[in-house]
Each structure stands twice: as structure tokens, then as C-alpha cells.
Amino acid sequence: MINAYILINMQPGNVDKAIKEMQKIENLAKISVVAGEFDIVVRAQVKNLEELLGTTDKIQTIDGVMKTTTQIIEKEIAL
């Protein structure tokens, strides 16, 4: 299983609509609206890199999505 964060830049005014579309995408474990450089951070859980590519492709086709940056989680430490 591969876990990754997909960091998303949105056009203003499209966040709520985009979230509704993202909720339809398989492999997304969490969607967070954040302040700062990015507007939305999504956590994806996929079987392989090909599936991750398909997931990011689906996100990139959503209206208002300007740019995505994907960060694959190499190691996670539970506190």
C-alpha cells in the first residue's frame, strides 16, 4: 500500500464544489482545507504508483484545480 499527500492549488471560489467531486474519487482517505501555500491537502491510499497517477489525473480534471503536487509518504511515525 502506498500512502501519499496530494497538495492542491485552487482557483478562488471553487473549493466547495471541488471537494464534492473529490468525495467521489476512490482511494482518497481524507480531504482537508488548509491555510497557506496550498488550498486543499488530500491523503491518498493506493496499491501502486500507476493507481496514484490515475488518482492525481482525476483530481487534475476537476474544475478549479490549478496545480497539484504529490508527496509520497516513505515512513510514518505514530505518536
Where are these regions (language model features)?
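A compositional/biophysical signature of low hydrophobicity enriched in polar/charged and small residues
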Residues: M1-L79
